[in-house]
């Protein structure tokens, strides 16, 4: 590449009825979750933010048991880690049936005369006959991922396309070349490709094949807009002023649910950011607080060991808090924001479905006025009806798939959050317990 320096390496890092749609944070279990509980799977449930807190005030007042009736072991906080391992094992078993594996890793920084950007290695392993080789390894930058998503939207308008992480960041607030930002984006891009690779339709898209295998995408990017996309634009133009008369209730229900779901996640995102800000401020105070005891110990010969112990204890607590804050910033918030973007993308597809139905209704009404002149239904009306039915079938299947993925993602997210908090309080408890012998030891004055 002309005018560029050597790349700098960065650290690598079942089907469900649409009427049974449930908020991921709802306290009421679904039938599917009940079935999972009977088979021994552990289900983590969280009360809805809208409901008052009716939980028992103490552990003694609460019946601690697992969904399958097995009493919970409260004496071993580390049991949450075993639950996380069980969820990971379920993912490994699902992976045995897949035939396409995609991974995004190894980000590298490229400094050119005109711009500076990050590329990521995209590795593919597959047994599909559509691919010439069983393994591929190419490098892609963010705009390549954006090109892929746009092509999927053009060629697969009846399906939910997974979201990409937001492209623009506020300059001066977020350093888009920092290791933390690059790693967070890498995880999001990896999740984006994995969702496409697991989709029974999107994974066979020709543009996805090109993205995974082509060494250079420039020749493919120069191709003009597809005919299907132009047809979609004409539909929007023709039906922009038409109001639907017979919109299916199930799709109206999905739209209402997505609005509420997105609102709840937005609230969680804002509150979580405030919590992180307060934790960072508290962390800064702790870092100043601990050394004071260490300095003081130099003046108190008789209290030297206890004061040094308190200083070390505060230091250990600040380290544990830093780890908890980093986990919330790098693991918790990205999932919340991904599903906020996912909801917005899904609502866009639902609007396209309404536009196709509006086109069908408009043509059907026009054909009805001429029914006396014709004995058969016009071909274009039948084609529009087929489009609507295709849209409906694809959206129902994608909605079921999205609900299953969402339930699994939020289960892992909440389980991970619980596990990290347990680890934090365990470390703080251990730190404070370690200095009790020093405080109880009565030293004789010399």
Swiss-Prot record:
It comes from the Eukaryota. GO terms for cellular component: early endosome; early endosome membrane. InterPro entries: AH/BAR_dom_sf (IPR027267), BAR_dom (IPR004148), PX_dom (IPR001683), PX_dom_sf (IPR036871). The keyword Membrane applies. Residues 1-84 are annotated as: Disordered. GO terms for molecular function: phosphatidylinositol binding. Keywords: Endosome, Membrane, Protein transport, Transport. Pfam families: BAR, PX. GO terms for biological process: positive regulation of autophagosome assembly; protein transport. Residues 1-18 have a biased composition (Polar residues). Residues 70-84 have a biased composition (Low complexity). It is found in: Early endosome membrane. A 1,2-diacyl-sn-glycero-3-phospho-(1D-myo-inositol-3-phosphate) binds at residues 141, 143, 171, 185. It is a peripheral membrane protein. SMART domains: PX (SM00312). Residues 243-446 form the BAR domain. Residues 98-219 form the PX domain. The keyword Membrane applies. Belongs to the sorting nexin family. Involved in the regulation of endocytosis and in several stages of intracellular trafficking. Together with snx4, involved in autophagosome assembly. PANTHER family: SORTING NEXIN-30, SORTING NEXIN-4. This is Sorting nexin-30. It comes from Xenopus tropicalis (Western clawed frog). The lineage of its organism: Eukaryota, Metazoa, Chordata, Craniata, Vertebrata. The gene is snx30.
């Amino acid at each position: 590449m002309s005018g560029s320096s050597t790349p700098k390496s960065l650290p690598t890092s079942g089907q469900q009825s649409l009427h049974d749609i449930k908020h991921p944070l709802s306290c009421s279990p679904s039938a599917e979750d009940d079935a999972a509980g009977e088979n021994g799977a552990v289900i983590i449930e969280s009360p809805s933010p809208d409901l008052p807190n009716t939980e028992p005030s103490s552990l003694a007042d609460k019946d601690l048991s697992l969904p399958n009736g097995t009493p919970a072991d409260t004496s071993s906080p580390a049991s949450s880690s075993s639950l996380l391992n069980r969820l990971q094992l379920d993912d490994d078993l699902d992976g045995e049936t897949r035939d396409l594996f995609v991974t995004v890793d190894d980000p590298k920084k490229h400094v050119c005369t005109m711009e500076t950007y990050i590329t990521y290695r995209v590795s593919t392993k597959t047994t599909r006959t559509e691919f010439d080789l069983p393994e591929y390894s190419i490098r892609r930058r963010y705009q390549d991922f954006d090109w892929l998503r746009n092509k999927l939207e053009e060629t697969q308008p009846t399906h939910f396309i997974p979201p990409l992480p937001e492209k623009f960041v506020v300059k001066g607030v977020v350093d888009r070349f920092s290791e933390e930002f690059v790693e967070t984006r890498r995880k999001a891009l990896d999740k984006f490709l994995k969702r496409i690779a697991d989709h029974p339709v999107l994974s066979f898209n020709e543009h996805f094949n090109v993205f995974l295998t082509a060494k250079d995408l420039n020749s493919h990017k120069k191709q003009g807009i597809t005919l299907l996309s132009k047809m979609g634009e004409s539909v929007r133009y023709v039906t922009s002023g038409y109001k639907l008369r017979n919109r299916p209730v199930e799709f109206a229900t999905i739209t209402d649910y997505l609005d509420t779901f997105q609102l709840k996640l937005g609230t969680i995102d804002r509150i979580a950011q405030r919590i992180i800000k307060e934790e960072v401020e508290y962390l800064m105070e702790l870092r100043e607080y601990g050394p004071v005891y260490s300095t003081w110990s130099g003046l108190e010969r008789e209290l030297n060991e206890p004061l040094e112990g308190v200083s070390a204890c505060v230091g250990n607590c600040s380290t544990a808090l830093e780890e908890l804050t980093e986990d919330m910033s790098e693991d918790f918030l990205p999932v919340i924001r991904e599903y906020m973007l996912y909801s917005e993308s899904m609502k866009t597809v639902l609007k396209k479905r309404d536009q196709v139905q509006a086109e069908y209704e408009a043509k059907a009404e026009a054909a009805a006025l001429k029914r006396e002149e014709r004995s058969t239904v016009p071909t274009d009306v039948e084609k529009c009806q087929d489009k609507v039915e295709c849209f409906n079938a694809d959206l129902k299947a994608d909605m079921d798939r999205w609900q299953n993925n969402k339930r699994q993602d939020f289960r892992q997210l909440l389980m991970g959050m619980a596990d990290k908090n347990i680890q934090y309080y365990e470390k703080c408890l251990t730190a404070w317990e370690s200095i009790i012998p020093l405080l109880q030891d009565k030293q004789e004055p010399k």
